[in-house]
Amino acid sequence: MVHQIHVIGGGLAGSEAAWQLAQAGIRVRLSEMRGIEATPAHQTDSLAELVCSNSFRSDDPTNAVGLLHAEMRALGSLIMAKADAHRVPAGSALAVDREGYAEAVTHAVAGHPLIELVRERVDALPADGPVIVATGPLTAAALADSIGAATGADALAFFDAIAPIVHHHSIDMDVAWMASRWDKGETKDYINCPMDKDQYLAFHQALLDGEKTAFKEWEKDTPYFDGCMPIEVMAERGVDTMRYGPMKPVGLDNPRTGRWPYAVVQLRQDNALGTLWNMVGFQTKLKHAEQVRLFRTIPGLGKAEFARLGGLHRNTFIQSPKLLDGALRLKSRPNIRFAGQITGCEGYVESAAIGLLAGRFAAAELLGRPIETPPAATALGALLGHITGGAEADGYQPMNVNFGLFPPLEGAKGGRKRKGDRKAMMAERAGEALKAWMDGGVEPA
């Protein structure tokens, strides 16, 4: 079969992209190296294998990921169809029989008359022709080098140091304040949470005592990225190490005392909307429950709601907000699209969702139809917007879908609405926006 497009990678994103293309009448070559070469993490040769958890997280449509589920179902997602067909009891979450689900995806993709599944390792980006790269966080070294050469990245495999991200509306600004160090610049760019000496010493000890997550076997030989150091490792190096690093208080006058605090935790705006703020320098291997407990002891963050918790793990992804256009094309080589975790989205569902969009966009392009991106008010549109420009390009890190990526509700600020009401209103708005988009768009044949 002479293919019209080459999809590299048979994970969730690549399988979904190939399916969307084939359903639109496009002939696809899908390359997957498992079957001839194993990865350190996968256990089978099945497409769309779930490497870690068997959970697709909440299926509640008033939760951001549950809303993403609903939107993907509406657009004919293969991954969601097979997940639903192999669902196992998990309360309000969508969990699956991982083997049955992956086998079903493999059977559907391999059996599609317009998809040629080829077990092969691709060592370089194809020179021409439409391509979707969906090789995930364990991209083979040779292909990672080729991607690095095409994108200007020096290295793509490293430990990404993920700092926690906090919803702005949950920060207590009666305790914290906005300022830049020494009041430099015309704007006050940081939210500052002050600590006195006793608070700092207690926080330092809690970091030392906190329960950490162990590295996986296949992560142990991967270097840190740019020498990033977990906050608890800084704590281990001395009681004052953090005060001379990310918790340095100099140049930050607390307007309530007129003095510098003993230490300070700074948060920096993380998205263009200003709804998400990251904890500067707080990459960590603390377990998630420990992070929530410990970081809520920081003055001003007592009721913090986290859009993402910190982490440190091996990953391979590109600087998508800088490199990709709004249709997931590489700006320097627009015949190449990226999809899935290699774009910097985090999670099974998010990876499949970006694969779905990449497949639909590529199909529209090949069929000579206009590319219609989903509205920003939808989960698909919010996630796409974050990846392709909504996030800050410098320091870009993987992110799960969350309501902080959506445009704020009009009227009263989100923090003045009850959390459940705000989510329900955003979900309702998203449903209306998706319907209008689908009614006005051209569906695959």
UniProtKB/Swiss-Prot annotation:
Entry superkingdom: Bacteria
Keyword field contains DNA-binding: no
GO BP field: tRNA methylation; tRNA wobble uridine modification
UniProt binding sites for FAD: 9-14
Entry GO MF terms: flavin adenine dinucleotide binding; tRNA (uracil(54)-C5)-methyltransferase activity, 5,10-methylenetetrahydrofolate-dependent
GO CC aspect terms: cytosol
EC top class named in words: transferase
Cofactors that this protein relies on: FAD
InterPro entries, A to Z: FAD/NAD-bd_sf, MnmG-rel, MnmG-rel_CS, MnmG_N, TrmFO
Main localisation: cytoplasm
PROSITE patterns: GIDA_2
Localization per Swiss-Prot or TrEMBL: Cytoplasm
Annotated catalysed reactions: uridine(54) in tRNA + (6R)-5,10-methylene-5,6,7,8-tetrahydrofolate + NADH + H(+) = 5-methyluridine(54) in tRNA + (6S)-5,6,7,8-tetrahydrofolate + NAD(+); uridine(54) in tRNA + (6R)-5,10-methylene-5,6,7,8-tetrahydrofolate + NADPH + H(+) = 5-methyluridine(54) in tRNA + (6S)-5,6,7,8-tetrahydrofolate + NADP(+)
Record carries keyword rRNA-binding: no
Family: Belongs to the MnmG family. TrmFO subfamily.
Function: Catalyzes the folate-dependent formation of 5-methyl-uridine at position 54 (M-5-U54) in all tRNAs.
Official protein name in the record: Methylenetetrahydrofolate--tRNA-(uracil-5-)-methyltransferase TrmFO
Organism: Rhizorhabdus wittichii (strain DSM 6014 / CCUG 31198 / JCM 15750 / NBRC 105917 / EY 4224 / RW1)
Gene this protein is translated from: trmFO
